[in-house]
């Protein structure tokens, strides 16, 4: 479905009369606290996307037959707002998040949205909630845009009506206990996505499908699952809910986007920085056997994941079948450290953004 024509909709604002106390930014967790307000907008067949509004954070009332509850027609995004040492608030590549949201919409038969308007609306919401952007080191305001199908109907088809909403949550430092490597388990019993499916969409079903394998990995003492392709079950795709990189000899390798791998914004940022720094950066298919062989020959130097929540997640141990290998002697490697520092320095305004990635919201 095509996006509606570009026009400036007026956002109505209703402020809460019961503001919540601000949390202690030095003791934040993840995804449990929410700000005073949220953004809502509806899609109606006769009007398109309409009725944009900022209003008090509140439950969404739904008919028990609402289609999203039965068939999972929904998409979402995840990004963060950061407070700099100067007190300004900024976003990291938000336009790319909204481009990806529309890509997900196309795959889920959801009407696309005006990306410029979404950014304007987000800036207005964050400006209202700026006191909720925490100032403690490495904390941030997590942003969750979501679209759900809202027709009360039990037939299997695309909905005619939708709700777009954005909620905000102050979150603590991801590496509160230190920037340490994780242990990952390679699974051949389960797949995250298949060719021709919706693996590249950010849709709830992809995450629900990962829960069982993830739970089994945790029971075995591993942090994440390393996903292989759903056809031959030998080519690496993602790790947990992140993209993944391998450093073999002097080459940085990331699995090529193939329709079942999410278009990670942090992944794209790592690739851009690697090229800027003149590293040998390759996007291609890479098999688990190649990784194991490169470790055996002493060529596997580092493995790390990339994503919005962790930014960079170094891997210190990997289990495949009966083989358990240590990577970088179980320590954080220099590549992972450099990418993590470079990205977080840009996000928090500690270094100048020479890539054009930062959108300043307010001060």
What is each residue range found by the language model?
Residues 24-27, 94-97, 102, 106-220, ...:
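Extended Lys/Arg-rich, glycine-bearing segments that form polyanion-binding/interaction patches
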């Amino acid at each position: 479905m095509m996006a509606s024509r570009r026009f400036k909709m007026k956002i109505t604002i209703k402020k809460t009369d019961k503001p919540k106390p601000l949390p202690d930014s030095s003791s934040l967790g993840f995804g449990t606290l929410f700000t005073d307000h949220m953004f809502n907008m509806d899609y109606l067949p006769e009007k398109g996307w309409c009725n944009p509004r900022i209003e008090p954070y509140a439950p969404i009332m739904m008919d028990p037959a609402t289609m999203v509850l039965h068939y999972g027609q929904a998409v979402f995004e995840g990004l963060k707002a950061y407070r700099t040492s100067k007190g300004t608030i900024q976003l990291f590549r938000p336009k790319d998040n909204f481009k990806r949201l529309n890509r997900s919409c196309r795959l889920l038969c959801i009407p696309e949205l005006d990306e410029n308007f979404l950014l304007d609306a987000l800036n207005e919401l964050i400006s209202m909630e700026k006191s909720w952007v925490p100032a403690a080191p490495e904390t941030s305001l997590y942003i969750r845009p979501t679209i759900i199908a809202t027709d009360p109907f039990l037939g299997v088809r695309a909905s005619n009506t939708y709700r777009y909403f954005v909620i905000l949550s102050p979150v603590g430092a991801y590496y509160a206990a230190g920037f340490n490597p994780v242990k990952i388990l390679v699974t051949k019993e389960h797949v995250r996505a298949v060719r021709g499916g919706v693996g590249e969409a950010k849709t709830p079903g992809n995450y629900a499908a990962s829960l069982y394998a993830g739970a089994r990995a945790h029971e075995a003492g591993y942090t994440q699952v390393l996903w292989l392709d759903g056809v031959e079950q030998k080519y690496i795709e993602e790790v947990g809910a992140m993209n993944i990189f391998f450093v073999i000899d002097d080459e940085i390798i990331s699995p090529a986007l193939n329709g079942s791998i999410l278009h990670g914004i942090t992944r794209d940022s790592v690739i851009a920085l690697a090229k800027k720094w003149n590293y040998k950066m390759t996007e291609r298919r890479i098999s688990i056997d190649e990784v194991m062989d490169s470790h055996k020959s002493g060529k596997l130097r580092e493995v790390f994941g990339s994503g919005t929540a962790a930014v960079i997640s170094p891997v210190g141990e990997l289990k495949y079948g009966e083989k358990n290998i240590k990577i970088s002697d179980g320590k954080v490697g220099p590549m992972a450290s450099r990418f993590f520092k470079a990205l977080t320095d840009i996000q928090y305004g500690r270094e100048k953004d020479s890539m054009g990635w930062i959108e300043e919201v307010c001060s």
